[in-house]
A protein has these predicted regions:
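GH16 jelly-roll
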Residues: 1-152, 357, 375-384
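Beta-rich carbohydrate-recognition and catalytic domains
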Residues: 7, 17, 34-44, 151-234, ...
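Short structured motifs
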Residues: 56-60, 235, 326
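Short, conserved beta-strand/loop elements in beta-sheet-dominated catalytic cores
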Residues: 67-88, 94, 391-404, 415-418, ...
């Protein structure tokens, strides 16, 4: 009879513990699939069993070809319970509070100790039943064995998996904290290519280490001509909660199907739940026919002849960009919006921060009270500075923003911006990253800065380490933000760390 099972090695059986992940044998001549665990009692070699036997016919009635197909047996084992599954059907649940050994096993719990894995095939015997020679030869085929261990610390740059063992696919994202749980939203990226194949993914966690997959919360549309039809590009999703309306509001950068990065739109969707589904509302450029608050009357009056500035990067071109040439160019249709983030201030006001003017200038725009549109109030910061990937946070009344330069998928030196008023004057400070590989942001690009709940002084810098040859294989970099004696934030590489 075939079995996939585990045994401990620190004591004799059964006090060492036994877990039968997959076992097949006959009970009173009837084939069964078993899911068991055994541990010790006060009697030597006397076992206490928690056993569930499911008749084989339970599976073959659903599918007569069941025996000829591969199936997945799975064990989820944590500090509280052992759960045994067959093709995602729970066969047995064994609470560890019940699995304490008797006196022979010194009242210890064998399932808090390591177990080793066995795969075997026994033939005949009491449990296997008589051997039917006519049925031989037979095959016991195993396609793979995989073991995943939940992380107890954040390890940047490695493959991160969710609680089901699947690779987390949430790139360019951000995290929302709501009612005791963190929700991580990000781009579902394909194995090859750059267009969106599924939509926006969501994962949830209570400890920032173990993430449950909540699904695609904003899928692409099957409707031909929809702004978010298959073939569009959905990037940098961020979600905020509106306390007044009770709605969860998602904004993201959208490029229309077949248009490359020309449309440069801001898109918005809304939901009654953090895990969706989100209803797509609209996409458009930002604040059409409205000038920025910090653009002078003189700059507004300038009439630009774009043909005179076709050659970029000249002193004359830089001067024109700083004075708002591209703002004027895009005035009627609205300002471009690419890499973006959202920020909710202490007074509940929300802001949309995005790369605009062909990625040359950052803009900060105030959102309406329901967070679903713009009020028309916005500013430009660092015209011609070539900033993208904004990630903003606030500490002790000071606003901080980490951005990157524009070098495509390749990493570059991060920038640190600061202000005392979000729609006020911003100034730039040196690279916040320190140490080895700091000039490349440790191989990543900023996407979000997450404030830890329960403290106003701890933040996590979130970045993506892009792999354009297979964007689905891009990695995550999460590092603690620290502050020097002057209160200026800095980021240093840490191999393994745990949020407090």
């Amino acid at each position: 009879w075939p079995a996939i099972w585990t045994l401990g090695s620190n004591m004799e059986w059964p006090s060492c513990g036994e877990i039968d992940i997959m076992e097949y044998y006959q009970i009173k001549g009837v084939p069964h699939i078993l899911a068991n665990a055994a541990w010790g009692t006060d009697k030597q070699w006397g076992a206490k069993w928690n056993s569930k036997a499911t008749p084989y016919i339970h599976f073959t009635e659903k599918d007569p070809e069941w025996a000829s197909k591969f199936h997945i047996w799975r064990m989820d084992w944590d500090e509280e319970v052992i759960k045994l599954y067959l093709d995602d059907e729970l066969l047995n649940e064994i609470p560890l509070k019940d699995t304490v050994n008797g006196s022979i096993g010194k009242r210890t719990n064998p399932f808090t100790k390591p177990q080793y894995l066995l795969l075997n095939l026994a033939i005949g015997g009491i449990n296997g039943g008589p051997i039917d020679e006519s049925a031989l030869p037979m095959k016991y085929e195993i396609d793979y064995v995989r073991v995943y261990q939940k992380e107890k610390k954040i390890v940047s740059g490695k493959v991160w998996r969710d609680t089901e063992g699947n690779v987390i696919n949430a790139h360019g994202g951000g995290v929302l904290y709501h009612e005791g749980k963190y929700y991580w939203f990000g781009e579902h990226r394909p194995d090859s290519g750059f267009v969106t194949e599924k939509g926006i993914n969501c994962y949830s966690s209570t400890d920032l280490l173990n993430w449950n997959y909540e699904g695609v919360v904003l899928p692409i549309s099957e409707a031909k001509g929809s702004d978010i039809e298959k073939g569009c590009i959905m990037e940098r999703p961020k979600v905020i909660y509106n306390k007044q309306t009770g709605k969860f509001v998602m904004w993201f950068h959208l490029e229309l199907k077949g248009r490359g990065y020309g449309p440069a739109r801001a898109a918005v969707a809304v939901s009654d739940s953090p895990t969706g589904p989100y209803c797509f509302i609209r996409s458009a450029r930002v604040n059409s026919s409205i000038y920025p608050l910090n653009m002078t009357k003189k700059e507004k009056r300038i009439k630009w002849n774009l043909s005179e500035y076709e050659k970029w990067w000249t002193p004359e071109w830089y001067d024109a960009v700083e004075k708002g040439m591209f703002v004027k160019r895009d005035l009627e249709g609205g300002q471009m919006s690419r890499d973006m983030t959202l920020f909710v201030d202490d007074d509940g006001k929300a802001y949309h921060i995005y790369s605009s003017e062909d990625n040359l200038t950052l803009q900060i725009a105030e959102l309406s009270d329901d967070y679903l549109s713009h009020t028309g109030k916005y500013i430009r910061i660092f015209p011609g500075g070539h900033n993208e990937a904004p990630a903003i946070f606030k500490k002790d009344g000071i606003y901080w923003m980490i951005t990157s330069g524009c070098t495509g998928w390749e990493p570059n030196k991060a920038r640190l911006l600061t202000a005392t008023s979000i729609l006020g004057e911003w100034k730039q400070l040196p690279n916040p990253c320190v140490g080895e590989n700091a000039d490349k942001t440790f191989g990543g690009q900023s996407t979000y800065v997450l404030p830890l709940q329960g403290t106003e002084k701890q933040f996590i810098f979130m970045a993506d380490s892009w792999r354009p040859e297979s964007l689905a294989d891009s990695r995550y970099i999460w590092l603690p933000v620290r502050f020097d004696e002057k209160g200026i934030p800095f980021i240093e590489w840490v191999d393994r760390w745990k949020p407090n």
